[in-house]
Amino acid sequence: MSNITMKELLEAGVHFGHQTKRWNPKMKPYIFGARNGIYIIDLQKTVRLFKGAYNFVVDAAQSGETMLFVGTKKQAQDSVSEEAQRCGMFYVNDRWLGGMLTNFSTVKQSIDRLKRLDAMVADGTIEAYTKKEALQMEKDRQKLEKTLGGIKGMNKLPGVLFVIDPKNEEIAVSEAKKLGIPVVAIVDTNCDPDDIDYVIPGNDDAIRAIRLLTSKVADAMIEGGQARNIKLQTDTEGAEFAAEAEGVVEETAGEA
């Protein structure tokens, strides 16, 4: 199990919230105090709540659920794409298109077009078009890749949403809520925690803080996925053994 320590949180600056004048009163239970006009997040609560979020993600992955990582602000983009890919999951780190979840069937059509354009580039069939047509198609492909590249392999709605800064990603959170998709999020002192199922109180602006928490969530997906694979393998071996044993019994009975 990937634990998170107070030392790691402090070194990454997870405890630094927003200026006291820019806060959401609903975050009061997660605030330790203020220093130099900045709210300080109660890291003891972060450790406890992160553990709950981590266990939830492990269980979700073990059940075969997928996760969509969402973080479109500049500080989050690299961590979101790299950690999502490391655990074999999906991500949105450029721009959230309205309806990405609630109108997924339409978004899927754009994903399919992106896949077709990728295939044309890969097998060279794009060269059969005029130079002008090929350039336009490549331009379209790059535009689609930028917004949809991270969900190219997502054939159905995700089981869990992991969000960095729900205030910035309020449309994504709203869509998940409408569809009953659980949301795990890094929630800073200026955010509304009410729509978040698993609140991780923390700094959602510092790159190191985002990287630390995102990598730990990716670890949870990996842990759950590995446990699922072991169980599936054990179940398969058990079924094969049972079938073999049944065959031996039948053979023995026949000889008798």
Swiss-Prot record:
CDD domains referenced in this protein's UniProt entry, alphabetically: RPS2
UniProt keyword list: Ribonucleoprotein, Ribosomal protein
Domain of life: Bacteria
Keyword Calcium: no
One annotated GO biological process: translation
The keyword Ribosomal protein is assigned to this record: yes
GO cellular component term, pick one: cytosolic small ribosomal subunit
GO MF terms, alphabetically ordered: structural constituent of ribosome
InterPro entries the record matches: Ribosomal_uS2, Ribosomal_uS2_bac/mit/plastid, Ribosomal_uS2_CS, Ribosomal_uS2_flav_dom_sf
Family: Belongs to the universal ribosomal protein uS2 family.
HAMAP family: Ribosomal_uS2_B
Name by which UniProt lists this protein: Small ribosomal subunit protein uS2
